[in-house]
């Protein structure tokens, strides 16, 4: 039976499976869409799925050879690849995570947008054209051109799978949260559904299906974002100063800032609180942390395997360069829009309500769409929400497909064909191996998506970028541009860079520390005792730069203002009783809505606190045995990236490799001229 007939049967069976699933008791009652409007969400999701499955059916008929499966036959134009790169790059973290972070933390959330856009300067200037000329399908191909093929492909494959797993986790979390919140399907079932669709694209359609799904998704995402921004910005006459002034003066934003600052907000006016939302420090409190995050985002893109793979789909190096230019224009425009999406969600929906639906803020964009369309009770509002959510869903599945293809390529092409079979596998065996590897990676993606429930997607993606920047980029960059680079340096740099990034994350504030969780839970349930007045405390210098990174000595402390005496804070049950009593007595619609939101949030906090106490009652330390963070930065890039470069240099100087030295001249000529580079297939 032909591949495209298998694809058609798979699509039909998937549809048959979906009907009872979507109407089953798995539907919960706590979604963002009222029951009477859920049919709209089903309908729009169905249209998106039908379009992408149609693309897969078409692509399956044109995917037979290894080059067609891995690189779409190298027939993608620069413009098409630019849109596909944007579709691959503008992930759930971009649309859901960044908009959510901006809506909750203001300026600090926008830092992610800036970092990810600037990253393409590195890709344009030093990566795109040489990689297209030298490589074939994978990161391992680039490194193996002048280094020992089996050794470098093995390490490159491990790194690719590691990075892709981090990134896959973020996308699967985003997909699960989105579907659960909108439709009410259990999170685990939602993740499985995303995984099945993604496998259909990759297994049957390969790179051709993945490319066109990414193009369609990118176009829809940009159009949806433009529409959202128009509706959000129009009430302010498209005036940026007026819009930002509305953000500063919004009571919901001011309340969010006061909550984040705690005691530091005691003597601040409402305007100062609002202004603070447009300044750094609410999420990334340390300037060093901001630098570390920026390094990971800027350098990580050039080491992301699924981005590097896109340069092998175009016929020439010039098209690779055009791809990056188009991608930068599309991505840059989109990231400007995220500022309005996040800020618009903050003033229209409110940080408290956004966090009530999803604590990571991932639903800010869809909730904003519902608001500007007329609200939760309107047909247009729910239709707009359904459209935006369906686009976000397509975003997740398209990016996941690209990641799975990258990881599967590493397993099949680098490990099976390159290492195990010694490049002697037939084309049919290679394609079969790629499809089997895709199934394995897809199953892994579903597993980690379920295991990582409740994490903010932009945060997880930043960690993936740190690993890529620390392990992959030093090896690729120095292989291309330093004559002394050899196999030993590449292996040492990739291993130490990636392992150090992961190890630093394991001892950082990103991990769960049970004693702190229990302490926070008890505050929610039992309240806090009265606090005496405190005098102002001047700033204290730290004991050195190392103290800002590791908990081995005293770090610098900012000045603390004087605070008045604080009364005792009631526990959750007492607070709930008072709020419920107040709700019953109020007649003002605005007050009633606010109280209902606050009660819902408090109820969620109480349930979480009770669950945390039960979950961690027997735990005293994190999974690596720490009771508090040892590494103080949220992102390890500041240390792990230089360490990766140093290890490539050190390993290359310490050991000699005659193959690496002998291949330098050929690599130099080929990366600059494209002589003997892989060409497009003739059709």
Whereabouts are the PLM-identified features?
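Membrane-embedded helix-loop-helix hairpins and adjacent transmembrane boundary segments
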Residues: 2-15, 20-683
């Amino acid at each position: 039976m032909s591949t495209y007939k298998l694809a058609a049967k798979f699509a039909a069976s998937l549809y048959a499976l979906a009907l009872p699933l979507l109407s089953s008791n798995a539907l919960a009652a706590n979604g963002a869409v009222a029951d009477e409007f859920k049919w709209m969400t089903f309908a729009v999701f169905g249209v998106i799925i039908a379009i992408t499955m149609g693309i897969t059916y078409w692509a399956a008929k044109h995917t037979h050879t290894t080059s067609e499966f891995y690189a779409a036959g190298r027939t993608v134009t620069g413009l098409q690849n630019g849109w596909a790169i944007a579709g691959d790059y503008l992930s759930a973290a971009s649309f859901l995570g960044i908009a959510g972070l901006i809506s909750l933390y203001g300026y600090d959330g926008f830092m992610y947008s800036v970092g990810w856009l600037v990253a393409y300067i590195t890709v344009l200037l030093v990566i795109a054209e040489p990689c297209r000329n030298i490589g074939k399908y994978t990161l391992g191909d680039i490194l193996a051109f002048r280094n020992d093929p089996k050794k470098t492909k093995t390490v490159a494959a491990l790194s690719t799978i590691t990075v892709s797993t981090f990134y896959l986790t973020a996308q699967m979390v985003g997909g699960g949260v989105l579907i659960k919140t909108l439709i009410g399907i259990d999170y685990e079932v939602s993740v499985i559904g995303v995984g099945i669709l993604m496998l259909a694209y990759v297994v049957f359609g390969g790179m051709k299906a993945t490319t066109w799904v990414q193009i369609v998704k990118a176009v829809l995402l940009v159009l949806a974002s433009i529409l959202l921004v128009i509706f959000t910005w129009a009430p302010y006459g498209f005036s940026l100063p007026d819009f930002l002034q509305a953000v500063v003066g919004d009571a919901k934003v001011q309340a969010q800032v006061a909550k984040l600052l705690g005691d530091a907000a005691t003597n601040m006016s409402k305007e100062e609180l609002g202004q603070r939302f447009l300044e750094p420090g609410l999420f990334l409190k340390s300037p060093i942390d901001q630098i570390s995050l920026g390094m990971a985002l800027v350098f990580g893109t050039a080491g992301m395997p699924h981005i590097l793979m896109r340069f092998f789909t175009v016929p020439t190096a010039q098209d690779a360069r055009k791809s990056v230019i188009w991608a930068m224009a599309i991505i840059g425009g989109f990231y400007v829009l995220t500022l309005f999406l996040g800020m618009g969600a903050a003033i229209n929906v409110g940080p408290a309500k956004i966090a009530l639906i999803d604590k990571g803020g991932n639903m800010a964009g869809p909730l904003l769409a519902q608001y500007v369309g007329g609200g939760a009770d309107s047909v247009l509002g729910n239709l707009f929400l359904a459209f935006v959510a369906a686009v976000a869903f397509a975003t997740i599945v398209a990016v996941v497909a690209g990641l799975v293809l990258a990881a599967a390529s590493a397993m099949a092409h680098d490990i099976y064909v390159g290492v195990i079979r010694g490049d002697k596998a037939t084309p049919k065996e290679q394609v079969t191996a790629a499809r089997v590897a895709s199934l394995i990676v897809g199953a892994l993606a579903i597993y980690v998506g379920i295991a990582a429930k409740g994490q903010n997607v932009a945060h997880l993606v930043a960690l993936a970028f740190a690993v890529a920047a620390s392990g992959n980029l030093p090896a690729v960059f120095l292989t291309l541009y330093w004559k002394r680079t050899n196999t030993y340096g590449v292996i040492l740099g990739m291993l130490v860079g990636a392992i150090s990034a992961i190890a630093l994350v394991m001892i950082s504030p990103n991990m769960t520390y049970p004693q702190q969780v229990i302490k926070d839970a008890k505050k929610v349930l039992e309240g806090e005792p009265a606090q005496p007045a405190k005098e102002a405390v001047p700033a204290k210098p730290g004991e050195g730069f190392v103290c800002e990174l590791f908990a081995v000595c005293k770090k610098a402390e900012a000045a603390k203002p004087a605070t008045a005496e604080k009364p005792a804070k009631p526990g959750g049950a007492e607070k709930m009783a008072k709020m419920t009593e107040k709700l019953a007595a109020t007649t003002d619609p605005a007050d009633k809505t606010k109280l209902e939101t606050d009660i819902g949030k408090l109820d969620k906090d109480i349930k979480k606190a009770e669950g945390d106490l039960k979950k961690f009652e027997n735990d005293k330390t994190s999974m690596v045995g720490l009771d508090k963070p040892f590494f103080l930065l949220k992102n390890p890039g500041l240390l792990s990236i230089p360490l990766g470069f140093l290890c490539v240099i050190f390993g290359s100087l310490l050991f000699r490799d005659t193959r690496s030295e002998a291949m330098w001249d050929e690599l130099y000529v080929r990366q600059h001229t494209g002589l003997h580079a892989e060409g497009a297939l003739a059709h």
